[in-house]
């Protein structure tokens, strides 16, 4: 098969059903155990939800925007994509939580290429390259290939 790709938008889709299924989405054939799901929730700073794996709910209405974004991160940790695209996927989080999330992604998905779209300068430290788009006549963008401090 081809590369495994996962896209996490600012407002992730969360299906109605059990919390377990919401975390495993979109991989219906996921063999992740409940322990794996709980570990992913804990890494995404949602450990308080661990006891609710069997609960059926419309999680998009139960969880706050930040919790939905963290659930999507737990999903990425379960899915283990080759390519992970984050489009403002941590915009609803405060900067310390965002840093903790990126640290977990880097630690738990060492072979995943992460492409982030965001506006916060704090995201720079988690990436090796930066493409900056500006509204200037004749210019689309410029590639900044400075090694971010502390990144691999």
Feature roles, as predicted:
Residues 1-5, 16-17:
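ABC ATPase nucleotide-binding domain
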Residues 20-58, 102-103, 111:
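ABC ATPase nucleotide-binding domain helical subdomain, centered on the C-loop/LSGGQ "ABC signature"
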Residues 14-15, 29:
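Bergerat-fold ATP-binding/catalytic subdomain of histidine kinases
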Residues 3, 11-12, 48:
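Intrinsically disordered, acidic/Ser/Pro-rich low-complexity regions proximal to membranes
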Residues 15, 47, 91:
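Nucleotide phosphate-binding site architecture
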Residues 6, 11, 19-22, 55-152:
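ABC-family ATPase nucleotide-binding domain "signature/switch" substructure
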